[in-house]
């Protein structure tokens, strides 16, 4: 008989606990959704853009709110946001290319194989950046982000993930090293 009372007591306790847990109003349950901002120069052009789009789709289909911030927006996709390009930003891009062209002694051979990242957009003041929990950098060259902008993103305190689609993040100048290892001790 004492075992029956004890069993009934445990059952009653579990029943009360069950009722309390499942009778809570839904307004008191807060679900937090992670927000990821994927940053890439182009929305569609290049392998990095393809990878960034696939990642964004996978995240959005699995309970994460992901947006992509690009310099070159071509679609009307609402999850892709283009930075505001101005005449000045286009001039800055051309000026950076001219400096590289001059340094290469007017050879077009490696004009787009090198990036000095002197110019770019400050994305830290954008609402998409402020809302994001995680910043994921992809291919961010040719006027998307400068070295100064990258430092500002890192100093924002948000976690930063950087997918290296080429050697630029390691070499700080060349997209492809082509057997050259000068970046390891100075170029």
Language-model features: where?
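Intrinsically disordered, low-complexity segments enriched in serine/proline and basic residues
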Residues: 1-10
């Amino acid at each position: 008989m004492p075992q029956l009372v004890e069993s009934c007591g445990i059952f009653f306790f579990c029943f009360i606990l069950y009722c309390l847990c499942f009778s809570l109003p839904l307004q008191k349950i807060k679900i937090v959704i992670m927000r990821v901002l994927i940053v890439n120069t182009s929305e569609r052009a290049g392998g990095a853009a393809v990878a960034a789009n696939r990642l964004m789709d996978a995240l959005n289909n699995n309970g994460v709110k992901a947006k992509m911030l690009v310099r070159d927006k071509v679609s009307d996709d609402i999850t892709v946001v283009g930075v505001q390009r101005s005449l000045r930003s286009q001039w800055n891009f051309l000026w950076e290319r001219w400096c590289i062209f001059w340094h290469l002694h007017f050879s077009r051979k490696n004009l787009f194989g090198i990036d000095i990242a002197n110019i770019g957009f400050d994305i830290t003041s954008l609402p998409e950046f402020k809302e994001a929990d995680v910043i994921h950098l992809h291919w961010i060259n040719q006027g998307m982000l400068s070295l100064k902008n990258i430092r500002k993103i890192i100093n924002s305190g948000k976690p930063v993930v950087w997918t290296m689609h080429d050697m630029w993040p390691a070499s700080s100048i060349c997209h492809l090293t082509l057997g050259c290892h000068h970046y390891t001790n100075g170029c």
